[in-house]
A protein has these predicted regions:
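Expand to "…catalyze enediolate/carbanion chemistry for C-C bond making/breaking, isomerization
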Residues: 25-350
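Single conserved hydrophobic/aromatic residue that forms the stacking wall/gate
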Residues: 1-23
Length: 350
C-alpha cells in the first residue's frame, strides 16, 4: 500500500517525501508501467582490502592502524572466545577513541555478534554510546532477512539521537547463510533505506549452511568442476549493484598460499567486487594489487570519457576509439575505473 504524504509539504520531511516517491516508482514498475529505476551508489568508500582484527588482541590494533589496509574491522564475533567478549568490547572502544583511523586512511568498523546472541545488544549500545562519533560502520554478521537490518538501524537511530551524535554510522552485512542468500535481494532493497552500505560474502559460514564439502575457506574443491562459490557471489553482487550497495568478497583461509588468494581475488574482481577480506596482514597488499586498476586501464578509461565527451558535443551518442565502438555503457564502466583510481590517489595523498 502506498502512503501518500499530506498535500501540503509543510512539516513533511524530505525523507518521507523520498519514501513516497520510491513507493510510487516501485508500484509503477511492478505493474509494468516503467521498465526500471536507477539506484545511485549509496556511499563510496575505498574497500580493496579489509583487515580483520580480533578485539581480544589489542596488540594488533596499532599494527592494523599502520598497515596498508583500506578498511579495518575490529571483531567481537567469531575471532573472540565467549569469556573474552566483554573485555574485547572495552578494548575496541578504547581503540576507536584513541587511534586516528580516518587520519591514517582507514575506514573503521566493528563486527558485532549476531542478533540471535545475548551479546549483540550490549555490543551496539556500549560501542556506539562510547565511541560512535568516531565509528564509520557496523558489520552485522549472519543477516538473514531485511528485518535484521531494520533492527540494527532502529537501535542506531535511538542511540545517536539520545547521545546527540552527529556522525551517522553506516551498516554493512555479512551474507553467510542460505536464508540470507535466499533473501539477498530483499535485504539490499529494504536495507538501503536503513543505512545499508555494503554486503560481504561470508564464505565459511555459507559453506556450512549449504553443507558444502570444502578444503580451504574460500578455496576451490577439486571435485567441483569450476568455482563452487560463483553462484552465491554472483547472486549477491547483482543485489548489491541493483540497489547501489558495495559488494565485498570474503576471506580466504590459507594465508600461506598467496597464489590461491590472488586467484580468488581476481575471480571476485572480474565479477565486479570492490575488495576482499584479509585475515592476515600478508594478504593486504595482495588484495590492494588485484583491486587497483592498472595504469593502462585507467588511461584507457580516461580516453573513453574524452572521446565520448567530444562525440556528445557533435551530437553523437557513440564514438570510435582504437577501431572499437564505445557508447554510454562504455562510459559507465570507464567512470567506475576512474572513480576508483581517484579514491586511491586521494588516500595516498593523505
Amino acid at each position: 500500500m502506498i502512503r501518500r504524504p499530506p498535500r501540503s509539504t509543510q512539516g513533511v520531511s524530505s525523507a518521507a517525501s523520498d519514501v513516497y516517491k520510491r513507493q510510487v516508482l516501485e508500484y509503477l514498475i511492478q505493474r509494468g508501467f516503467m521498465s526500471h529505476i536507477i539506484y545511485e551508489p549509496v556511499k563510496q568508500r575505498l574497500q580493496r582490502s579489509e583487515l580483520a582484527v580480533p578485539g581480544s588482541n589489542p596488540k594488533m590494533f596499532e599494527k592494523a592502524l599502520k598497515s596498508s589496509a583500506d578498511y579495518v574491522f575490529l571483531d567481537l564475533e567469531d575471532a573472540v572466545a565467549p569469556d573474552d567478549k566483554v573485555p574485547a568490547r572495552k578494548n575496541i572502544i578504547e581503540a576507536i577513541n584513541d587511534l586516528d583511523w580516518n587520519g591514517n586512511g582507514k575506514t573503521i568498523s566493528v563486527r558485532i555478534n549476531s542478533i540471535d546472541t545475548h551479546y549483540m545488544y550490549r555490543d551496539v549500545v556500549e560501542v556506539v554510546e562510547q565511541a560512535g562519533d568516531k565509528l564509520d560502520t557496523i558489520l552485522l554478521p549472519k543477516a538473514g532477512t531485511a528485518s535484521d537490518v531494520y533492527m540494527l538501524s532502529a537501535m542506531l537511530n535511538q542511540i545517536e539521537t539520545s547521545k546527540g551524535l552527529k556522525n551517522r554510522i553506516g551498516i554493512e552485512v555479512l551474507i553467510e547463510t542460505t536464508l540470507g542468500m535466499a533473501n539477498v535481494m530483499d535485504i539490499a532493497q529494504k536495507g538501503r533505506e536503513e543505512r545499508l552500505e555494503a554486503m560481504h560474502f561470508g564464505v565459511a559460514d555459507y559453506a556450512a549452511s549449504c553443507r558444502a564439502r570444502t578444503t580451504v575457506i574460500g578455496g576451490l574443491n577439486p571435485d567441483y568442476p569450476g568455482d563452487q562459490w560463483h553462484a552465491g557471489l554472483s547472486q549477491m553482487l547483482v543485489a548489491c549493484r541493483a540497489y547501489g550497495i558495495r559488494a565485498i568478497d570474503g576471506p580466504f583461509g590459507d594465508f600461506n598460499d598467496p597464489e590461491s588468494y590472488i586467484d580468488a581475488a581476481k575471480r571476485g574482481a572480474a565479477l565486479g567486487f570492490e575488495g576482499k577480506w584479509a585475515i592476515h596482514p600478508s594478504q593486504i597488499d595482495l588484495a590492494n594489487e588485484v583491486y587497483t586498476p592498472p595504469e593502462s586501464e585507467v588511461s584507457h578509461a580516461k580516453q573513453i570519457l574524452i572521446a565520448l565527451d567530444e562525440a556528445a558535443k557533435e551530437g553523437r551518442g557513440a564514438a570510435q576509439l582504437n577501431g572499437r565502438m564505445i557508447d554510454a555503457a562504455s562510459a559507465k564502466m570507464a567512470e567506475n575505473i576512474v572513480n576508483t583510481d581517484n579514491a586511491i590517489t586521494s588516500k595516498l595523498k593523505g
